[in-house]
Amino acid sequence: MKNTIVIKLGGVASDNLTDDFFQQIIKWQAEKKKIVLVHGGGHYITKMMKALDIPVETKKGLRVTNKQALEVTKMVLIGQVQPAITTAFQKRNISVIGLNAGDTGLLEADQINDSDLGFVGKITKVKTALIEQLLAENIITVIAPLGINSAHDWLNVNADTAACEVASALNAEALYLLTDVPGVKNGAKIIDEIATDEINKLQTTDIIKGGMIPKLASAAFAAENGVGQVIITNSLENPGTKIKSKVAIR
């Protein structure tokens, strides 16, 4: 969708939205850009799980999600994180609406074939009609990373993956993956640009690890599937690291 910008907010990033962030959103809207946000909430999910004495586990950067963890994830994402984001927009008189998998089955997903991960899903389809309808009315959409399978079971979906799938489905002109670091680091230095075919090498040499592994895998998917530009950064003003299709690392 021409002139569409997708922004993924990490759990911590969503709690620290600055005036500069909102000024950039307002500027883009004045330029007739359409804005979609996909939010995470891992920090708050972990905090709630610990408070409820539910074990917190991850595997290859993904949260292990049993039935209890899934219910906590839904509660935190839809009941805490998303309302905080939409309220921040409303305070600035910016039209916004929160969406989740329960809205027209927005994100269809299949359960990942890994019994250790539990109720973790991979998106198979993004139903863009509702999103496009809202964008046509200049309403910003804020999407929780939860999917629903063919049996109408809810699944936890990695927020980076969800954002990249949404951006690809909309053929977005840009995708910003906002996180708590200013870009992908090689030691103390930020890598300006990464080619999708160089990501495996960065992983095997331990330049990327932990949660950055699925983040870069998702970014590579977006870069190779219709998204104009993909940027990993900590703010909309920071150039961060650009992920490009098969371009040498600089």
Curated annotation (Swiss-Prot):
Biological process terms in GO annotation: arginine biosynthetic process via ornithine; L-arginine biosynthetic process
Catalysed reactions listed for this entry: N-acetyl-L-glutamate + ATP = N-acetyl-L-glutamyl 5-phosphate + ADP
Positions with a binding annotation for substrate: 41-42, 63, 156
Gene3D superfamilies, per database record: Acetylglutamate kinase-like
The keyword ATP-binding belongs to this UniProt entry's keyword annotation: yes
Domain of life: Bacteria
Annotated site location: Transition state stabilizer: 8, 215
Entry's EC annotation: 2.7.2.8
Keyword Zinc: no
Keyword terms, alphabetized: Amino-acid biosynthesis, Arginine biosynthesis, ATP-binding, Cytoplasm, Kinase, Nucleotide-binding, Transferase
Pathway membership: Amino-acid biosynthesis; L-arginine biosynthesis; N(2)-acetyl-L-ornithine from L-glutamate: step 2/4
Main subcellular location of this protein, as a coarse class: cytoplasm
Gene Ontology terms, MF aspect: acetylglutamate kinase activity; ATP binding
Subcellular location: Cytoplasm
Family annotation (HAMAP family): ArgB (MF_00082)
Function: Catalyzes the ATP-dependent phosphorylation of N-acetyl-L-glutamate.
Family statement drawn from the similarity comment of this UniProt entry: Belongs to the acetylglutamate kinase family. ArgB subfamily.
Name of this chain's protein: Acetylglutamate kinase
Organism: Listeria innocua serovar 6a (strain ATCC BAA-680 / CLIP 11262)
